[in-house]
């Protein structure tokens, strides 16, 4: 009899714990620390909330937060509806936002930590900087859920202590291959802010088009696709300011000396090499073109373009390219005593002083400059390398003392798996039975498609020493736009890139070191629904059945622990 009572007691306790657990709202990215109390639901009227802050940026962010709460009427799955009869109204409508130092600028490595406390006494956000407080508001926005009684509640009192694991949590977009409208770029910034990503790397131009209007060389935009596909100086400044207001840095990239044709040749055709060659003879994709490293005019133009853009883009970091330099483009200049490596070294010797004249400048380059067949012996150790080749490059570079941003094409190239795009390619006709051609039928050079699970499971600091790990600034997903424009930009990126957001914010392991992909599944599926509620056209990841029936679509009934 006593045993039966004990069994019943423990069963009831287990059921109680299940109910308590099910009622908790999980936000994305998962915070470092969340403590839920076992008390009653807190009823909040978002229309009555007011921010207790003197910071205009935070006041505007608070207005957006309240608007999103009311617009989304968010209720995550599979949380049961709340009976608010036993709930308690919050005692004050003031949201207290305390910032220790509101003067700190948004730059690489800024303190983004925050603490959020919600109970019946009120809502309090405490952060070291304005940028941490923005993250606190984003978390608050996801925690307040809507009920069938048309009320808004937080399931119980909760305390969140949070900070990111990595300084750089990035996304790269490319407006050189296909134009991206201002509105489509702003949408990416919105979703980045919602997922606490902080770095938008903007590959502004490429050999195909130059969409950036410059006062120093106004005729460069003759190589824009049309008059409607141009970014004015005001457009650029608006995007930078819009992003900053949401805690997102905008890092510009002008790819040099490779991938350079459009725009540059409008200034002076002599500063571009191999522009008239057929592309397969001189480039990795059409059209060909690289800057003439031997011409003094080249460096005059580089200086003027770079300085004007540095006045517009306020971030300390500027990406100056240096990828995929093609030896065959310089065939007319090469000799046994003047190799393409010699040309690259000469370019760096002349270009680096130009780049470093800007105060507080931090340069980023693609890893090609040290790891490709055409590479320099060394570059200054204060240059950050973006690793897109083999993942072994991370250890190679960090062991040599370089900071890196990881963008492995095997895990983080979002354009992969979309099939080849070069037209009239007879190889598809000649070898239809060869499923291995160009990584298989479809011809994507970097297939397969990078799913959210592939992204989330990527351990990008594996086999690194602690010293080497300290040189990893973070990770960045990259979407090259050969097959992307504004019509599909958001759906190509989201919600799978939210896996990267969590991976770089709090990681993919729990406090015991166990992989938490099992619990992340429902978190990212809900985050997708949340984005849809806010009006964003993001891709479904699974049939909705899987969202409504958590883990019914898992491969294994009893998932392995690893």
Curated annotation (Swiss-Prot):
GO molecular function: beta-N-acetylglucosaminidase activity
Induction comment from the UniProt entry of this chain: By growth on N-acetylglucosamine.
Glycosylation sites: 38, 52, 111, 337, 382, 396, 463
Gene Ontology cellular component list: membrane
Biological process terms in GO annotation: carbohydrate metabolic process; glycosaminoglycan metabolic process
Enzyme Commission designation: 3.2.1.52
Signal sequence, renumbered to the chain: 1-22
Xref: Gene3D superfamilies: Chitobiase/beta-hexosaminidase domain 2-like, Glycosidases
Catalyzed reactions: Hydrolysis of terminal non-reducing N-acetyl-D-hexosamine residues in N-acetyl-beta-D-hexosaminides
Taxonomic superkingdom: Eukaryota
InterPro entries membership: Beta_hexosaminidase_sua/sub, Glyco_hydro_20_cat, Glycoside_hydrolase_SF, Hex-like_dom2, HEX_eukaryotic_N
CDD domains: GH20_HexA_HexB-like
Free-text function comment from the UniProt entry: Has a broad substrate specificity.
PANTHER family in the record: BETA-HEXOSAMINIDASE, BETA-N-ACETYLHEXOSAMINIDASE
Family, per entry: Belongs to the glycosyl hydrolase 20 family.
Protein name: Beta-hexosaminidase
UniProt source species: Candida albicans
Lineage of the species this protein comes from: Eukaryota, Fungi, Dikarya, Ascomycota, Saccharomycotina
């Amino acid at each position: 009899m006593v045993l039966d009572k004990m069994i019943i007691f423990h069963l009831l306790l287990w059921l109680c714990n299940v109910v308590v657990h099910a009622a908790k709202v999980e936000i994305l990215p998962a915070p470092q620390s969340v403590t839920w109390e076992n008390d009653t639901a807190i009823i909040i009227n978002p229309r009555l909330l007011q921010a207790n802050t003197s910071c205009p940026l935070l006041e505007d962010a608070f207005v957006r937060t309240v608007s999103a709460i009311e617009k989304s009427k968010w209720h995550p799955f599979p949380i049961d509806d709340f009976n608010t009869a036993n709930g308690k109204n919050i005692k004050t409508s003031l949201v207290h936002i305390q910032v220790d130092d509101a003067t700190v600028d948004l730059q690489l490595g800024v303190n983004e930590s925050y603490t959020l406390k919600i109970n019946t006494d009120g809502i309090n956000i405490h952060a070291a900087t304005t940028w941490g407080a923005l993250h606190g508001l984003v978390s608050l926005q996801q925690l307040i859920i809507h009920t069938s009684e048309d009320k808004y509640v937080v399931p119980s009192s909760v305390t969140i202590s949070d900070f990111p694991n990595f300084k750089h949590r990035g996304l790269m977009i490319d407006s050189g291959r296909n134009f991206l409208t201002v509105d489509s770029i702003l949408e990416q910034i919105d979703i980045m802010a919602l997922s606490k990503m902080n770095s938008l790397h903007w590959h502004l131009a490429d050999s195909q088009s130059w969409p950036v209007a410059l006062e120093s060389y106004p005729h460069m935009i003759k190589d824009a696709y049309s008059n409607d596909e141009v970014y004015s100086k005001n457009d650029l400044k608006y995007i930078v300011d819009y992003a900053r207001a949401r805690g997102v840095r905008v890092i510009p990239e002008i790819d040099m000396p490779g991938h350079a044709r459009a725009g540059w040749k409008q200034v002076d055709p002599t500063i571009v090499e191999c522009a008239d060659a057929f592309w397969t003879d001189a480039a990795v994709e059409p059209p060909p073109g690289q800057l003439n490293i031997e011409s003094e005019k080249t460096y005059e133009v580089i200086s003027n373009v770079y300085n004007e853009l540095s006045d517009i883009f306020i971030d300390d970091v500027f990406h100056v390219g240096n990828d995929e330099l093609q030896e065959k483009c310089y065939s007319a200049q090469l000799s046994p005593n003047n190799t393409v490596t010699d040309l690259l070294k000469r370019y760096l010797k002349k270009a680096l002083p130009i780049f470093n004249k800007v105060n507080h400048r931090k340069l980023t380059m693609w890893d090609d400059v040290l790891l490709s067949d055409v590479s320099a012996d060394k570059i200054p150790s204060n240059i950050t390398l973006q690793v897109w080749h083999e993942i072994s490059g991370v250890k190679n570079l960090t062991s040599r003392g370089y900071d890196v941003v990881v963008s492995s094409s095997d895990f983080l190239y979002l354009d992969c798996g979309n099939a080849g795009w070069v037209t009239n390619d007879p190889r598809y006709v000649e070898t239809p039975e060869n499923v291995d051609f160009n990584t298989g039928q479809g011809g994507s050079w970097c297939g397969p498609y990078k799913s959210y699970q592939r992204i989330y499971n990527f351990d990008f600091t594996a086999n690194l020493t602690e010293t080497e790990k300290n040189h990893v600034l973070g990770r960045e997903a990259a979407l090259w736009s050969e097959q992307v424009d504004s019509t599909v930009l958001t759906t190509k990126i989201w919600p799978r890139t939210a896996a990267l957001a969590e991976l770089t914010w709090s990681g993919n392991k729990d406090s015991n070191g166990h992989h938490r992909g099992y619990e992340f599944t429902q978190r990212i599926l809900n985050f997708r629904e949340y984005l849809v509620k806010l009006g964003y056209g993001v891709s479904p990841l699974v049939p909705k059945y899987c969202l409504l029936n958590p883990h019914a679509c898992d491969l294994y009934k009893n998932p392995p622990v690893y």
